[in-house]
Amino acid sequence: MEVVILPGSKQIGALAADAIEALLRRKPDAVLGLATGSSPLPVYDELARRHGQAGLDFSRVQAFALDEYVGLEPGHPQSYREVIRREFTDRVNIAPGNVHHPDGSAADIPAACQAYEDAIKAAGGVDLQLLGIGTDGHIGFNEPGSSLASRTRIKSLIEQTRRDNARFFTNIHDVPHHVLTQGLGTIMDARHVILIATGAQKAQAVRDFVEGPVAAICAASVLQMHPHVTVLVDEAAASSLRLADYYRHTYDSKPAWQGL
């Protein structure tokens, strides 16, 4: 796990975009894993800028969303299908048919979850997965207590997560109680994971998952077992890390040829 401490969101967005651009140069038909929430927005903004100004090409890319609310129609403005479309995919030249989402409106939820797992596998797996992290250490919607080997499934949202997400809705009562989410085992199958965290409110979660024990109480801690994880944090989110000086030193001392 590589921890990179940066001044702010702009620098985080640029560095994550560098990694994605390098991937697309090597592999134009790469498979991206897309997250929602505020954390990946600087990355999407920077990728859209590079597409518009420098022609960064997404025409052969496939993308898989991490999660989707259960019970929201696909066109609902806060469905993750619509959020990802507005915030990213409509701003680049990725084919709409190449952007995949769990089907939160399916009549047969278990079958929809298995179909999503099958689609990821058929695409060759995710090359690079973007993640944020919740204040309780959740990734995707794998809340505390989630199985570290879990696959795509339905999950109930805890009240803290519903409160965190209420800012995207009229009020907390409009936030659904259930989601479909890629499991921790599904996320761990991605070849490269980039997790982004900003702000002091994420500092404890960052410390817990980077430097704490691997345990279901902090779902993101499973990433300690992944062979290629990059953690991009601002100074505020890094403020509780005991080894912050070490992380700064190792990043500053990296060979110029070594990317993320």
UniProtKB/Swiss-Prot annotation:
Organism: Arthrobacter sp. (strain FB24)
Protein name stated in the entry: Glucosamine-6-phosphate deaminase
Pathway: Amino-sugar metabolism; N-acetylneuraminate degradation; D-fructose 6-phosphate from N-acetylneuraminate: step 5/5
Any one of the GO BP annotations: N-acetylneuraminate catabolic process
GO molecular function: glucosamine-6-phosphate deaminase activity; identical protein binding
Family: Belongs to the glucosamine/galactosamine-6-phosphate isomerase family. NagB subfamily.
Entry-linked CDD domains: GlcN6P_deaminase
Cross-referenced SUPFAM superfamilies: NagB/RpiA/CoA transferase-like
Keywords: Carbohydrate metabolism, Hydrolase
NCBIfam families per UniProt: nagB, PRK00443.1-4
PANTHER family linked to this entry: GLUCOSAMINE-6-PHOSPHATE ISOMERASE
TM segment ranges: none
EC main group: hydrolase
Gene: nagB
PROSITE patterns in UniProt: GLC_GALNAC_ISOMERASE
Keyword Hydrolase attached: yes
Active site per database record: D67 (proton acceptor), D136 (for ring-opening step), H138 (proton acceptor), E143 (for ring-opening step)
The EC number(s) this enzyme carries: 3.5.99.6
Role played: Catalyzes the reversible isomerization-deamination of glucosamine 6-phosphate (GlcN6P) to form fructose 6-phosphate (Fru6P) and ammonium ion.
InterPro entries linked: Glc/Gal-6P_isomerase, Glucosamine6P_isomerase, Glucosamine6P_isomerase_CS, NagB/RpiA_transferase-like
